[in-house]
């Protein structure tokens, strides 16, 4: 009588063991995404190029602002000299021309800034398109089934940080990126 109970118990145990073995604990790796974006080869090159574009915009802004400032001061002095009288047609024409120049300068700077922002977004899109697969490649190599950003952790055990491995994998598949505005640099109001 005890033999059938013993056999039934062993059979139940044999069925339960594979189920318990398949529920192995999660193997987690941690990636410092900030470090990846700062240190990958394509990221560094793109950052230098984007910084140069930003500097060019600042220089253009200064070049446009200097003559406008002088002209604004001259217009203000002419208006102050009127002592409250109505400006003549020539002064009104100068003021209108100044406003047109100022609007044109603002539009140019806005277009340059939009191009820079579009270039930044395009760079991020290219990096992100390769970063995910690079992380998955490292996860597979490490036998991990979960990757977490370093900034979303409270504590990390030794051997869990695979940022260096991700950098190697990303640099291999993404040697450079295009630092140009993306396809859609304007909004269409859709």
List PLM regions with ranges.
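Bacterial N-terminal signal peptides that target proteins for export
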Residues: 1-9
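Bacterial N-terminal signal peptides
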Residues: 8-17
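Amphipathic, charged alpha-helical segments and their helix-to-coil junctions
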Residues: 2, 22-190
């Amino acid at each position: 009588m005890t033999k059938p109970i013993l056999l039934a118990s062993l059979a139940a145990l044999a069925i339960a063991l594979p189920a318990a073995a398949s529920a192995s604990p999660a193997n987690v790796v941690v990636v410092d995404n900030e470090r990846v974006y700062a240190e990958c080869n394509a990221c560094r090159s793109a950052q230098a190029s984007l910084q140069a574009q930003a500097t060019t915009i600042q220089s253009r802004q200064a070049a446009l602002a200097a003559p406008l400032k002088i002209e604004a001061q001259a217009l203000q002095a002419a208006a102050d000299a009127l002592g409250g009288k109505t400006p003549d047609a020539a002064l009104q024409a100068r003021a209108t021309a100044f406003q047109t120049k100022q609007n044109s300068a603002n539009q140019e700077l806005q277009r340059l800034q939009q191009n820079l922002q579009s270039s930044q977004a395009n760079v991020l899109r290219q990096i992100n398109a390769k970063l995910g697969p690079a992380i998955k490649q490292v996860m597979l190599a490490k036998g991990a089934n979960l990757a977490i950003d370093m900034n979303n952790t409270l504590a990390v055990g030794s051997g869990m940080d695979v940022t260096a491995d991700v950098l190697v994998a990303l640099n291999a598949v993404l040697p450079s990126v295009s630092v140009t505005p993306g396809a859609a640099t304007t909004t269409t109001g859709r």
